[in-house]
A protein has these predicted regions:
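Short acidic, Pro/Gly- and aromatic-enriched capping/linker segments at domain boundaries
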Residues: 2-12
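Nuclease catalytic cores
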Residues: 12-57, 256
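Intrinsically disordered or highly flexible coil/loop and linker segments, enriched in small
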Residues: 21, 53, 57, 110, ...
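Residue-level signal for well-ordered alpha-helical scaffold segments within enzymatic catalytic domains
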Residues: 25, 46, 50, 103, ...
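Hydrophobic (often cysteine-bearing) scaffold residues that line and stabilize catalytic clefts
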Residues: 36, 40, 44, 93, ...
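Mg2+/Mn2+-dependent nuclease catalytic core
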Residues: 116-227
């Protein structure tokens, strides 16, 4: 029997965007190259998680007074070390991290008139009717007398459009979790702080009981599907077969595939053209235990511990929507 699939906001978002991407990510567990945006987001989250603790407020005060990380050698050093660890250090990445960290610190970081008692709060919601399980992490819950504000940091290049915000899975999941974790705080607001937008970083949303009730039935629907998901299902809702999104529909449909026609294609400025990590074929390695279970996949053989199992060389053939199929009569064309 396959392992139970527990929902998360990112898992649902992937499932909605493309069935093949979901299959590659959560069933095949194929490796992915990290990118600078993800690296910067990881580093910023680490700094926020540390500075929100009262014992580190002296670093916050120094940085805010000088408006630069130079004022705290310890924080500056940690940012640089973290970027190196993420294999993404460059002066450009460091300066972008500094800018984003300053935006986060400058926006009610300690929750004026509120308390931040549980940063990086983990939750697991289990419901029998409707039936679902969903887990997640809340970046920063700010508790007030009768209100809870859940702050989530975003390092993306674009903010949510109106439709993306009003039906945001992550925000609804956070609000559901808040009902369990902080039952006395009935007024729940979710605030997304977009760190690349210093002039207007905040987007806020709250939901009604009716909206949350409907969301729970949607969770049951997705939970049922992903726990009976097959390779045939993986080809049933491909991003490439969806219509191109309208201006107010955000990043969806074929945009998820990217416009690159082949691996390594360059844009006019000489930089790599982005594409879905599973669009084209690639080689990788798998670590398999004695019972035949997959332990880990990696592009680098050196990342796998051979003492824990057998290392196998693997080939991924690419997305079926973008892979040219062999044709016995191809010579006629």
């Amino acid at each position: 029997m396959s392992k139970e699939q527990i929902l998360s906001a990112s898992k649902i978002k992937t499932f909605e965007s493309c069935s093949w991407k979901y299959w590659c990510n959560y069933h095949l567990k194929l490796p992915q190259e990290n990118n600078d945006g993800a690296r910067r987001g990881t580093v910023c989250h680490l700094i926020f998680e540390l500075l929100v603790k009262a014992r580190h407020k002296k670093h916050f005060d120094l940085i805010m007074e000088a408006q630069t990380l130079d004022a705290s050698p310890a924080v500056k050093r940690l940012v640089k070390k973290s970027l190196v660890k993420e294999e993404g250090y460059s002066e450009e990445n460091y300066l972008l991290c500094e800018e984003m960290i300053l935006v986060g610190l400058d926006n009610d970081f300690y929750g004026a008139k509120g308390e931040v008692n549980s940063p990086e709060k983990e939750f697991l919601l289990e419901s029998e009717s409707p039936k679902y399980k969903i887990r997640g992490f809340i970046d920063k819950p700010v508790e007030y007398n009768k209100k809870l504000k859940i702050v989530d940091y975003k390092s993306s290049k674009s903010k949510f459009n109106k439709n993306e915000l009003k039906s945001n899975v992550q925000a609804m999941a956070y609000t559901l979790a808040a009902q369990t974790i902080w039952p006395k705080l009935k007024n729940v607001i979710v605030e997304f702080l977009f760190l690349r937008f210093p002039k207007s970083p905040s987007q806020q949303i709250r939901f009604t009981k009716e909206q949350l009730s409907g969301f729970e039935y949607y969770l049951e629907h997705v939970y049922t599907i992903i726990n009976n998901f097959t390779e045939s299902d993986a080809k049933s809702n491909l991003a490439s077969t969806k219509p191109m999104p309208k201006r107010d529909e955000g990043f969806c449909g074929p945009l998820n595939c990217g416009f690159a026609k082949y691996k390594g294609q360059l844009k006019k400025d000489g930089t790599l053209m982005w594409h879905c990590p599973f669009k084209f074929d690639f080689e990788y390695y798998s670590l398999i235990d004695a019972d035949g279970n997959l332990l880990k996949n990696s592009f680098n053989k050196e990342d796998l511990d051979e003492s824990k199992g057998e290392i196998k060389h693997q080939s991924y053939g690419g997305c079926p929507a973008h892979t040219r199929q062999d044709d016995d009569f191809d010579f006629l064309n």
